[in-house]
Curated annotation (Swiss-Prot):
The protein, known as: Calmodulin-like protein 4
Statement: the UniProt record of this protein carries the keyword Cell membrane: no
Subunit structure, as described in the record: Interacts with MYO7B; the interaction mediates the association of CALML4 with the IMAC/intermicrovillar adhesion complex. Interacts with MYO7A.
Function: As part of the intermicrovillar adhesion complex/IMAC plays a role in epithelial brush border differentiation, controlling microvilli organization and length. Acts as a light chain for MYO7B and is required for efficient targeting of the IMAC to the tips of border brush microvilli.
Region (Disordered): 1-43
Organism: Homo sapiens (Human)
Family: Belongs to the calmodulin family.
Amino acid sequence: MAAEHLLPGPPPSLADFRLEAGGKGTERGSGSSKPTGSSRGPRMAKFLSQDQINEYKECFSLYDKQQRGKIKATDLMVAMRCLGASPTPGEVQRHLQTHGIDGNGELDFSTFLTIMHMQIKQEDPKKEILLAMLMVDKEKKGYVMASDLRSKLTSLGEKLTHKEVDDLFREADIEPNGKVKYDEFIHKITLPGRDY
């Protein structure tokens, strides 16, 4: 698996996310919710499934207390976490700034969809792991020593405990002092879990 396949491409256009859960787009501007048709549906499908959109709309509606099609910026982090994202306060602030929304502002559903898409895309576990491994593998050999990877996983970003790293290595069949090949490691730890 080549590294370039895991790195994100250009971000989607905001127009790609102007889609309500029912499949109809809305016209943005001065609070208008005038339908624009479903011509954007196929473009949206390449980013989010209809099931995801419906799930996001349901969560968004829980925080849209006035039922005006908007949620408070202060509710954004909680709404994102309810949907399985793990944004930091700094990431939430950057998302809001990107869309010109201050901490006391509001955001509509299409903006929420865009933010969720960008957050989920940036949280791609394969990408995160690859970037961590590339930091360790300065000579670009295609592998890192398990001890070096352990050091990075326990000291950077969302730090793992030594027990969590042990569990991760055990799951991926990695010896504590062995070599860790990118492709094999990423493949093993990102396989979907089995339902028993």
